[in-house]
C-alpha cells in the first residue's frame, strides 16, 4: 500500500451500507467550543465563545455520518448569528451532511452594559443564552433561551413583618420559539421589568438604597413573577411558543420555590 501514490484511493468506511437497517435520530458532535459574534439591540456586534452541539438524522442504510463536516461548517461560518443566519446555517449543514433533518444548539455568555439607577455608573452583567435551530419534516424552527438573574421579595413576609421582608436572587428562564428575529435584550428586559427588581454588576450606596426600596415596593411570589412574564410573552407576536421558568433561591429556606408556564399560541382555540 503506497499512500503517496496519487492513484491510491483511501477507503471511506462511514459511507458503506449498514445492514442492521436501524435509523439514528440524532448523530453528530457535542461540546465544540468555537467563537461567534452576535448582534446587540443597538445594531452593534459582540464577540463571545459558544459551546456548540450539531447533529443530523442518519438513514437506516448508512453506516456513519460525516463528522468532520460539522466542524468545517463552524470554520466556514461568519457574521453575526441572527435568527435568519441561524436558519441559513441549518440549511447549509443539511446540504453538507446530505441529511433531511438536523439540529444546531449553541450556548454562550452574553453581556449587557447597564447603567446604575442613581449614580449612573456603568458595568457589565452576564446572561446565559442558548440558541437552537431544528429542522424536521421540512419545517425549520428557531428557539432563543435566556437565563435572567433578578431579585424577588416575598409579599407574605412584607405583610406580616413590622419592618423588612425576606428577599433573594431569582432566575427567570425564557425558552421561546421565534417567528421573527428577537434581540436577546428584549427577552432580558421582559424578565427584569416584571421582577421585584433587576440586578446590576456595580452599585454605589445610593443605588443600593434604590434597589432595596424598589424591591420592597414591588413584592412578588414566584407565581406572580412567572405569570407577569407570561403575559408579556403572550402579547409579543414575534414569539409563537414558550417554556417559562422562575426559581427563587429562598433566603429563609434551604430549598427553592419554583414555577413553570408552558404555552403554544398556535394551539389556542
Swiss-Prot record:
PANTHER family: GTP CYCLOHYDROLASE MPTA (PTHR36445:SF1). The record marks 154 as: May be catalytically important. It catalyses: GTP + H2O = 7,8-dihydroneopterin 3'-triphosphate + formate + H(+). This is GTP cyclohydrolase FolE2. Belongs to the GTP cyclohydrolase IV family. InterPro entries: GTP_cyclohydrolase_FolE2, GTP_cyclohydrolase_FolE2/MptA. One of its GO terms (molecular function) is GTP cyclohydrolase I activity. It comes from Burkholderia thailandensis (strain ATCC 700388 / DSM 13276 / CCUG 48851 / CIP 106301 / E264). The keyword NADP does not apply. GO terms for biological process: tetrahydrofolate biosynthetic process.
